[in-house]
């Protein structure tokens, strides 16, 4: 049974069809796997190598894939239903098959491993553009380009030279052959048309404003992809410095207050999201850190929420700020930690773990120890609050116990015992 390649189109006479995926589960236990029986036929209908959609399934499912090209067996580890894979295939088709302009599946991929770019051209509407290379499958495509793909300008130049050589051979006339007769006087021969002119025509033939704008957009997209690839090849230190310059520029331009989403997006692009708080503390904090925690809470929360690694970097960033403004901040450590804790930027577990070991990676060993000594009152308060909460839970459990009274039982004499134990609540402002 066939289905529409673009399943969002419900027209039964839609010309682009593909066979429905057939999945077969094999094996047991840890060796269970799903074999896509007709992957070759499906890939042929999409004009893509069968390894691409199979690898796409692996990326989306977080599963390993196996390719047995000789026997046409394409395998995804684990047990997966055919309907689930069919729905997942729609995502692959949308990202890597359909034209963004006309939504027809008549596209070819043009992979350039040297420049780390993947181009996309449509034979239906003439669209030409660059694919977004953020998806994990793009790494696989760059390493395994399709057979019909251009692998860079070197290949084109080589083909161009070969064509020129063949043209010269075909155009040369040997002495043994008789030259062709000249055309009649009243017949005009067409002007010579070389291969070089044909190759140059497709760039300059359309001079309308819209065509020029489209070409410029393609160039800018191409440049963005190249920049992204170059940045990800840099070291972690270099990428963190790029993020630092980005945040610093936003502050200098006076738009830092509304740039929290852009900063997180840039950190994710550079793959240094966990280290974002370390950069933010350096740019945004000074001796007025307590007021600044409230002001930039949203910025830090985008990094630190449910991210313990980012919270640890925030604490290391705090150490760096204290090192720069030691005279003003060293005595305020407990208050600063309390502000961060109340703002939901730090969790108890992370703070306690940080306090147990001094590190000399960001500040001197002596200063790191002194900071933790100054933080002890707050750490003690945290631990006692945690013990009280756990004790309260035990009391709640005791209250839920059902007591059965007996009329025949003797009632013991109850003596009232005065408790000298008083709850000593710690006032954090008095620390």
Curated annotation (Swiss-Prot):
There is a cross-link at residues 413, 418 (Glycyl lysine isopeptide (Lys-Gly) (interchain with G-Cter in SUMO2)). The record marks 15 as: Arginine finger. GTP binds at residues 27-34. Residues 178-193 have a biased composition (Pro residues). GO terms for biological process: formation of cytoplasmic translation initiation complex; regulation of translational initiation; ribosome assembly. Residues 143-216 are annotated as: Disordered. It is found in: Cytoplasm. Residues 196-209 have a biased composition (Acidic residues). Residues 233-392 form the W2 domain. GO terms for cellular component: cytosol; plasma membrane; synapse. InterPro entries: ARM-type_fold, IF2/IF5, Transl_init_fac_IF2/IF5_dom, Transl_init_fac_IF2/IF5_N, Transl_init_fac_IF2/IF5_Zn-bd, W2_domain. Its main location: cytoplasm. One of its GO terms (molecular function) is GTP binding. The keyword Transport does not apply. Keywords: Cytoplasm, GTP-binding, GTPase activation, Initiation factor, Isopeptide bond, Nucleotide-binding, Phosphoprotein, Protein biosynthesis, Ubl conjugation. Residues 153-170 have a biased composition (Basic and acidic residues). It holds the Pfam family eIF-5_eIF-2B. The modification Phosphoserine is found at residues 10, 229, 389-390, 410, 419. Component of the 43S pre-initiation complex (43S PIC), which binds to the mRNA cap-proximal region, scans mRNA 5'-untranslated region, and locates the initiation codon. In this complex, acts as a GTPase-activating protein, by promoting GTP hydrolysis by eIF2G (EIF2S3). During scanning, interacts with both EIF1 (via its C-terminal domain (CTD)) and EIF1A (via its NTD). This interaction with EIF1A contributes to the maintenance of EIF1 within the open 43S PIC. When start codon is recognized, EIF5, via its NTD, induces eIF2G (EIF2S3) to hydrolyze the GTP. Component of the 43S pre-initiation complex (43S PIC), which is composed of the 40S ribosomal subunit, EIF1, eIF1A (EIF1AX), eIF3 complex, EIF5 and eIF2-GTP-initiator tRNA complex (eIF2 ternary complex). Interacts with eIF1A (EIF1AX) during scanning. Interacts through its C-terminal domain (CTD) with EIF1 or with eIF2-beta (EIF2S2) (mutually exclusive) through a common binding site. Interacts through its C-terminal domain (CTD) with the CTD of EIF5B. Interacts with FMR1 isoform 6; this interaction occurs in a RNA-dependent manner. Belongs to the eIF-2-beta/eIF-5 family. This is Eukaryotic translation initiation factor 5. It comes from Pongo abelii (Sumatran orangutan).
């Amino acid at each position: 049974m066939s289905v529409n390649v673009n399943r969002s189109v419900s027209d039964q006479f839609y010309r682009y069809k593909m066979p429905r995926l057939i999945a077969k589960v094999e094996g047991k236990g840890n060796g269970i796997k799903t074999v896509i029986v007709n992957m070759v036929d499906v890939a042929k209908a999409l004009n893509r190598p069968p390894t691409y959609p199979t690898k796409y399934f692996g990326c989306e499912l977080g599963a390993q894939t196996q390719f047995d090209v000789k026997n046409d067996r394409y395998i995804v580890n684990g047990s997966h239903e055919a309907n689930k894979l069919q729905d997942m295939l729609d995502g692959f088709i949308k990202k890597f098959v359909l034209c963004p302009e006309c939504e027809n599946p008549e596209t070819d991929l043009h992979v350039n491993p040297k420049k780390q770019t993947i181009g996309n051209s449509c034979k239906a509407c003439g669209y030409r553009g660059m694919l977004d290379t953020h998806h994990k499958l793009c790494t696989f495509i760059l390493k395994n380009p399709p057979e019909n793909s251009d692998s860079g300008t070197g290949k084109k130049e080589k083909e161009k030279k070969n064509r020129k050589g063949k043209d010269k051979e075909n155009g040369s006339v040997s002495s043994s052959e008789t030259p062709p007769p000249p055309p009649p006087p009243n017949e005009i021969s067409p002007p010579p048309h070389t291969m070089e002119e044909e190759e140059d025509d497709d760039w300059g033939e359309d001079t309308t404003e819209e065509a020029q704008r489209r070409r410029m957009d393609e160039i800018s997209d191409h440049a963005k992809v190249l920049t992204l690839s170059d940045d990800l090849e840099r070291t972690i230190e270099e990428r963190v410095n790029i993020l630092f310059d980005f945040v610093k520029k936003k502050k200098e331009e006076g738009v830092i207050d509304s740039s929290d989403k852009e900063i997180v997006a840039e950190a994710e692009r550079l793959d240094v999201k966990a280290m974002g708080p370390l950069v933010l503390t350096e740019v945004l904090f000074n001796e007025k850190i307590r007021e600044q925690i409230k002001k930039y809470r949203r910025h830090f929360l985008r990094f630190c929420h449910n991210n313990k690694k980012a919270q640890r970097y925030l604490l290391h960033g705090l150490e760096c700020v204290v090192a720069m403004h030691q005279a003003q901040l060293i005595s305020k450590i407990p208050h600063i930690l309390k502000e961060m804790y109340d703002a939901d930027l730090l969790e108890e577990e992370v703070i306690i773990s940080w306090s147990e070991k001094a590190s000399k990676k960001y500040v001197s060993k002596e200063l790191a120890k002194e900071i933790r000594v100054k933080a002890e009152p707050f750490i003690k308060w945290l631990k006692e609050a945690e013990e009280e909460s756990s004790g309260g839970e035990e009391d709640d459990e005791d209250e839920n116990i059902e007591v059965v009274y007996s009329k025949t039982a003797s009632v013991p004499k109850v003596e009232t015992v005065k408790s000298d134990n008083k709850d000593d609540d710690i006032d954090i402002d008095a620390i």
